[in-house]
Amino acid sequence: MAGPPFALGFLRRREVVFPTWRGWLVLALLLMAGGRGFLAWVQPFLAVSAPVGGEALVVEGWIPDYALREALRVFRAGGYPILIATGGPVPEGSALAFHGNYARLAAATLREFGLPADSIIEAPAPAVRKDRTYAEGKALAAWMREEGRVLGSLDLFSFSTHARRSRLLYRLALGPGTRVGVFAARDRDYDPERWWASSSGFRQVTDEWIAYLYAKSAFRE
């Protein structure tokens, strides 16, 4: 009669330790506390505002009109000599497609809001399949080369949870010679302190968190 498998050298006994009910309770409480901490931390982490007092205010042209109004207030209060609008093509079929690109659309909107035309520069980005924000930063770098202008520092005006990722990708696109600060306009569609309680807030924060992790760890120029 053959012996048990343990005797054949294929298996061996191990002692496994499981938490008691008190241990499971403590573990559950720790997970809940960590989850609540993450919920409170992640939105303001992504929607960062950290300006450096740059030589120009760069505005991502795709942001909504109320955010462009806020950008105009920041431009005037900060005493920036120029405002640079960036952005790629407006999608075909859009009512605003006649502008061609978001840089031109934002510039036109800001002029309507009262910003003098000679204070605005357009730096449109080409159509790309992915990494649109990085393409916007490269378009700005190309404009600087073409104009022979060197911006040692600039402040980027972005939108809500997109801000941290935008700053990261603009830094990569512009290189170490340009310091990049950032402003994050507030999204009016949800309460940032309870972003998980609305579909808009949940979708925006989770999408941007995943996109930021990709940009930080897997993006290659």
Regions found by a protein language model. Give the residues of each.
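A generic structural signal for solvent-exposed, polar alpha-helical segments
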Residues: 5, 86, 149, 201-202, ...
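A transmembrane-helix-recognition feature enriched in membrane-embedded lipid enzymes
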Residues: 197-221
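A structural signal for short, hydrophobic/glycine-enriched beta-strand patches
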Residues: 43-197
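N-terminal type II signal-anchor transmembrane helix
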Residues: 5-48
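Residue-level recognition of hydrophobic positions within alpha-helical transmembrane segments
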Residues: 18-20, 132, 203-204
